[in-house]
């Protein structure tokens, strides 16, 4: 494992290795056991999209691992003034031990990896969000103990989260059902791959997708950069909500996950959110532990 650019780059055993290490790091963290695996290491964090969870979890993670993190916005980088990504990659590779980037274009992440000489971590692009899904898988395993025989249901926009969740669910052997409007489906190549490699469905039939689900997941209707589409999206997605009706067809012990931030009474009702708040905030915490595992895998000597 040289980089984390997208979840498709990892096989089942590699994901399990990360989850096992994340579990260990979480246990040590909760029990006051220091683990300075990255003493003397520096992570550069490039943010072209704002974030709460990504910045805080990576910065805290590097500190807990004995290293340090540098926050770099567009205003701090010549890349924001037209410097080619390949030049930025080669320069930062001389100063840093790794780069985490949260940006719009997947190509920018791929270019950093191609032209740089240090590990690159995809903190989010419009195409995928591998770090979040590693935390999701960690949380599912904590609650369900195993991925065997589980049905995973996602309700909402077929966006970067849906793309990575499909890959994560199918890779780990879960059945995966996506409920979304027909014009907002996930990436066609990812859906083709999912059909070839597991049990996968995508339709606008919300209740059929949620039927007998072990995990029900959602995300905001309008992601960052889609603010001008918000009113239109609210009309299109108004029925694509996790509510009592949806939970009524899922399994009795179904868990609910949300990558946050949540817009109550839009993609999820306040009632369902609060009933499953422990799961959702365990999931949020697990961003820290899953990403620390990725950092150790990539940056430790």
Where are these regions (language model features)?
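Adenosine-phosphate binding glycine-rich loop
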Residues: 253-254, 260-301
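Glycine-rich phosphate/diphosphate-binding loop of Rossmann-like nucleotide-binding domains
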Residues: 48-60, 142-218
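Positively charged, low-complexity intrinsically disordered leader regions
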Residues: 1-56, 60
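Short, structured coil segments at secondary-structure junctions
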Residues: 65, 95, 115-116, 172, ...
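Active-site cofactor/substrate anionic-group-binding motifs, chiefly glycine-
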Residues: 42-43, 47-95
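Anion-binding alpha/beta catalytic cores of soluble intermediary-metabolism enzymes, centered on
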Residues: 97-168, 258
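Rossmann-like adenosine-cofactor binding region
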Residues: 195-271
């Amino acid at each position: 494992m040289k980089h984390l650019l997208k979840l498709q780059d990892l096989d089942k055993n590699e994901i399990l290795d990360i989850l096992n290490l994340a579990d260990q790091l979480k246990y040590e963290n909760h029990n006051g056991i220091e683990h300075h695996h990255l003493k003397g290491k520096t992570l550069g964090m490039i943010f072209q999209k704002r974030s709460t969870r990504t910045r805080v979890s990576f910065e805290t993670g590097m500190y807990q691992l004995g290293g340090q993190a540098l926050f770099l916005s567009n205003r701090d980088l010549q890349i924001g003034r037209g410097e080619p990504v390949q030049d930025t990659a080669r320069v930062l590779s001389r100063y840093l031990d790794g780069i985490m980037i949260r940006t719009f274009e997947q190509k920018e992440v791929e270019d950093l990896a191609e032209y740089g000489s240090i590990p690159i971590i995809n903190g989010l692009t419009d195409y995928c969000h591998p770090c979040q899904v590693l935390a999701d898988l960690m949380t599912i395993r904590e609650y369900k103990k195993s991925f065997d025989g589980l049905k995973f249901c996602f309700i909402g926009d077929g966006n970067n989260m849906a793309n990575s969740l499909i890959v994560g669910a199918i890779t780990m052997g879960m059945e995966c059902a996506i409920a979304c409007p027909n014009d907002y489906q996930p990436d066609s190549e990812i859906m083709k791959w999912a059909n070839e490699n597991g049990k996968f469905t995508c339709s606008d039939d919300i209740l059929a997708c949620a039927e007998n689900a072990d995990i029900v997941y959602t995300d905001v209707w309008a992601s960052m950069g889609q603010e001008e589409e918000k009113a239109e999206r609210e009309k299109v997605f108004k029925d694509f909500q996790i509510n009592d009706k949806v939970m009524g067809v899922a399994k009795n012990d179904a868990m609910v996950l949300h990558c946050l931030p949540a817009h109550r009474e839009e993609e999820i009702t306040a009632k369902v959110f609060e009933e499953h708040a422990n799961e959702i905030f365990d999931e949020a915490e697990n961003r820290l532990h899953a990403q620390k595992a990725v950092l150790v895998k990539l940056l430790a000597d």
